[in-house]
């Protein structure tokens, strides 16, 4: 007879880093009796979630996709950002057959190359250096008409920081002697991931038909006008730059974001023949629509950089060992706790169940800082009490999503809501003899103001993240841990040998 599972719960507090600086630190300011008690009574420490420790360039802040990939893989996963940057440096990028093939088709027919992407040095969804390289590639291969449709950031970068990025691309086009920025729009519209199709349609119509709320002679003038309307980068409304540019039949369209989750909705509008989420005024017969990476196996668009496969990630290895698992999150982070945590796999593993709790329908999450955390917690407590699962993996979105708003008071409320939820999980586990690991994927909410500019700090950080063991074992947290060490730690607690593919090592050692 098999023993009843007493679940091991991995609690991922998204965007919940650690900083010893109390100023503008929502975690420090929050009333969080549960978290404080756990830190005082349970084995705890800090682990790294940024830079080379997660497969990103040195000094690069972590993000949710990267964090969950590393958490689930049990090894450092070298990220698409790093792969693309290396290919540009090595020159391989300029010979990439998917990119060159798309450009050559357009050039051969005397047509245009349209480059879409987040124009930012944030490095979370894209990097401006990649957009520069794409413009250079198009020019090298003879494209005369090169148009950049720039999505502005202000979320993974300071809220009003797009000027330098626009100047970089303007200078690039001037140096090439061809090409220009054709449109501006905030990522709030172009990069939605919560089925707000009215936002996506504004971006689609701007790119395809140059349908804009505002026009400007230059991109910098368009940005200045948006700031005058009190629109920060993320929220810049559809702005046509210069003469109208449309996506015509035979043009090539290349989406230069390397992160998938916020590239899917707009891509679907471009490539799905039976798309019904909004009425497309026109669907051009493009020579090619390319994604820099694979945005989804279900989206029919070639990827310039195909996904690298990861074998024996935590979910797969649990399934092979007959263990049951539950993945749960609200909409904003559901892809992270499923697709990314599973190493880029869409389908559940055998014995894996998933629960999606809808995120609240508010314009920005400072308006509802608790988000759907109470509802997520209801379902977790229920699952713990049922004792059906060996492992439960939950993501709480609040620290990251409310942190991104830059509203300090709301961020404090988000942390306090999380504290209540964690307390409910710990109490439920105590009743059944379960255990938990509490950690985060990257920092955010611990720094809510930019100390240099005084602006709201809406981006992620490079701070370490907490790691707390909740249970009865006599263990301690070793130093030097990284996100890739979390899965091997879980396997050790479950009494399973880690697979050879997992190069991480347990963060917990005997006390």
Curated annotation (Swiss-Prot):
Matches recorded under CDD domains: iPGM
Keyword flag Magnesium: no
EC number: 5.4.2.12
Catalytic reaction list: (2R)-2-phosphoglycerate = (2R)-3-phosphoglycerate
Disulfide bonds: none
Keywords noted in UniProt: Glycolysis, Isomerase, Manganese, Metal-binding
Family according to the record: Belongs to the BPG-independent phosphoglycerate mutase family.
Top-level class of the enzyme under EC nomenclature: isomerase
Lineage of producing organism: Bacteria, Pseudomonadati, Pseudomonadota, Gammaproteobacteria, Pseudomonadales
GO cellular component: cytosol
Gene Ontology terms, MF aspect: manganese ion binding; phosphoglycerate mutase activity
Pathway recorded for this protein: Carbohydrate degradation; glycolysis; pyruvate from D-glyceraldehyde 3-phosphate: step 3/5
The name this protein goes by in its record: 2,3-bisphosphoglycerate-independent phosphoglycerate mutase
């Amino acid at each position: 007879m098999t023993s009843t599972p007493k679940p091991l719960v991995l609690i991922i507090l998204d965007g919940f880093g650690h900083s010893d600086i109390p100023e503008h630190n929502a975690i420090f300011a929050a009333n969080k009796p549960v978290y404080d008690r756990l830190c005082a009574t349970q084995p705890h420490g800090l682990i790294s979630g940024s830079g080379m420790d997660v497969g990103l360039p040195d000094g690069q802040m972590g993000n949710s996709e990267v964090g969950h990939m590393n958490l689930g893989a049990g090894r450092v996963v070298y990220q698409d950002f790093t792969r693309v940057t290396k290919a540009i440096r090595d020159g391989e990028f300029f010979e990439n057959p998917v990119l060159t093939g798309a450009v050559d088709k357009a050039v051969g027919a005397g047509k245009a190359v349209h480059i879409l992407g987040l124009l930012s040095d944030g490095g979370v969804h894209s990097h401006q250096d990649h957009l520069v390289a794409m413009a250079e590639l198009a020019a090298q291969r003879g494209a005369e008409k090169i148009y950049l449709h720039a999505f502005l950031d202000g979320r993974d970068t300071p809220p009003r920081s797009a000027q330098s990025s626009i100047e970089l691309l303007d200078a690039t086009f001037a140096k090439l002697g061809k090409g220009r920025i054709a449109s501006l729009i905030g990522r709030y519209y172009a990069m939605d991931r919560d089925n707000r199709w009215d936002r996506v349609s504004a971006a689609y119509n701007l790119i395809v038909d140059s349908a804009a709320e505002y026009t400007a002679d230059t991109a910098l003038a368009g940005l200045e006008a948006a700031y005058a309307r009190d629109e920060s980068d993320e929220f810049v409304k559809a702005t046509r730059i210069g003469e109208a540019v449309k996506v015509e039949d035979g043009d090539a369209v290349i989406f230069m974001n390397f992160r998938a989750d916020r590239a899917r909705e707009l891509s679907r509008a471009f490539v799905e023949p039976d798309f019904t989420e909004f009425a497309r005024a026109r669907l051009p017969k493009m020579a090619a629509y390319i994604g820099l990476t694979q945005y989804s196996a279900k989206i029919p668009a070639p990827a310039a950089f195909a996904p690298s496969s990861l074998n024996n990630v935590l979910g797969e290895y649990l399934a092979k060992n007959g263990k049951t698992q539950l993945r749960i999150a609200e909409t904003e982070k559901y892809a992270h706790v499923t697709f990314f945590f599973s190493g880029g796999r869409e389908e559940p593993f055998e014995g894996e169940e998933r629960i999606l709790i809808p995120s609240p329908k508010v314009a920005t999450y400072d308006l509802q800082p608790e988000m759907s955390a109470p509802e997520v917690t209801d379902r977790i407590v229920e699952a713990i009490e049922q004792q059906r699962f060996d492992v439960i993996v939950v993501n709480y979105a609040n620290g990251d999503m409310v942190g991104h708003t830059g509203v300090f008071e709301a961020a404090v409320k988000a942390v306090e809501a999380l504290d209540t939820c964690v307390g409910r999980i710990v109490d439920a586990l105590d009743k059944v003899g379960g255990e938990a690991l509490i950690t985060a994927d990257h920092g955010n909410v611990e720094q809510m103001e930019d100390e240099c500019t005084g602006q709201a700090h809406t981006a992620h950080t490079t701070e370490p993240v907490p790691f707390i063991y909740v249970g009865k074992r006599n263990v301690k947290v070793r130093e030097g841990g990284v996100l890739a060490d979390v899965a091997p730690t879980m396997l050790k607690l479950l009494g399973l040998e880690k697979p050879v593919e997992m190069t991480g090592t347990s963060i917990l050692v005997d006390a």
